[in-house]
From Swiss-Prot:
GO cellular-component term (any): ribosome
Keyword Transferase in annotation: no
HAMAP family registered for this protein in UniProt: Ribosomal_uL24_B (MF_01326_B)
Lineage: Bacteria, Pseudomonadati, Pseudomonadota, Betaproteobacteria, Nitrosomonadales
Pfam families xrefs: ribosomal_L24
UniProt KW keywords: Ribonucleoprotein, Ribosomal protein, RNA-binding, rRNA-binding
Organism of origin: Nitrosomonas eutropha (strain DSM 101675 / C91 / Nm57)
Membrane-spanning ranges: none
Protein family: Belongs to the universal ribosomal protein uL24 family.
Gene name tied to this protein: rplX
Quaternary structure, from the entry: Part of the 50S ribosomal subunit.
Listed name of the protein: Large ribosomal subunit protein uL24
Position of the signal peptide: none
Keyword Ribonucleoprotein: yes
PANTHER family, per the entry: MITOCHONDRIAL RIBOSOMAL PROTEIN L24
GO terms for MF: rRNA binding; structural constituent of ribosome
Length: 107
């Protein structure tokens, strides 16, 4: 499988939408192009009570997925969004790096 530029657990910044400029981490991938980011794109959802499953009804806030093109990986050294490239390290493994300064993301 091809290596992805953004992975689960990466520190990202939101590029567009109502949460533009927020920094957070990727929680999970919903599909190939949709990502759930912690505390971003939160919406209120109405939940019906279900006593057999011990679910209390009411209004809850959940995180909805956003498109992967609306986020960018965050470079903490430069304190801004950055692009990701791929290269092979000395042992022959493929690793990600920041294109602006060449520092490795995967150590």
């Amino acid at each position: 499988m091809a290596m992805k530029k953004i992975r689960k657990g990466d520190n990202v910044i939101i590029l567009s939408g109502k949460d533009k400029g927020k920094q957070s981490t990727v929680i999970k991938f919903e599909s190939v192009e949709k990502v759930i980011v912690r505390d971003v794109n939160r919406v209120k959802s109405h939940v019906k009570p279900n006593p057999s499953k011990n679910i209390v009804g009411g209004i809850v806030e959940i995180e909805k997925p956003i498109h992967v093109s609306n986020i960018a990986i965050f470079n903490s050294d430069k304190n801004k969004a950055d692009r990701v490239g791929f290269r092979f390290n000395e042992s022959g493994n493929k690793v990600r790096y920041f294109k602006s300064d060449g520092t490795l993301i995967d150590l």
